[in-house]
């Protein structure tokens, strides 16, 4: 969902009053060093490095003050997004599922770091590089919604089970909305590296 004021205005009309969400289906997930196919006819494939937290025990009605007790660890997601499809869905008023759930569009990993190994999960530098050139550098401290906000909100009525994962949302710096966006969208042959300080680097290769 929305995690920064830096996303383009046609993706977010205003900052929501509470965390928003969508689902990444299991069928779209891929691993570290995965080769992800850019579907034919798609030209606006964007990158979104995101911090993921993994639930360690069942949470229902969790409070912000105790939220971190439910978190087992953290990892990285590159929330690959087909803007061709997403922008059409946004324009029609529907949620953007299709452009985020194409097979392979959920690179995840390469490992889960236990939460006790992270001194401050709200002060981690996140970067995204394409072919060795840095495209993005942001800090988790700039996120609107913290892990505690997200878990309290979604566990209010829905039981969150051990093993469930929440990706904490897109930072600013993605290709969409930039003047040279057409040059920045991912193309076959591109190697994308999403890194989060203290966690690891997740690498993905785009192919035809």
Task: Annotate each predicted stretch with a short phrase.
Residues 83-208:
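Catalytic-pocket segment enriched in acidic/His residues
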Residues 6-134, 207:
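Active-site microenvironments in enzyme catalytic cores
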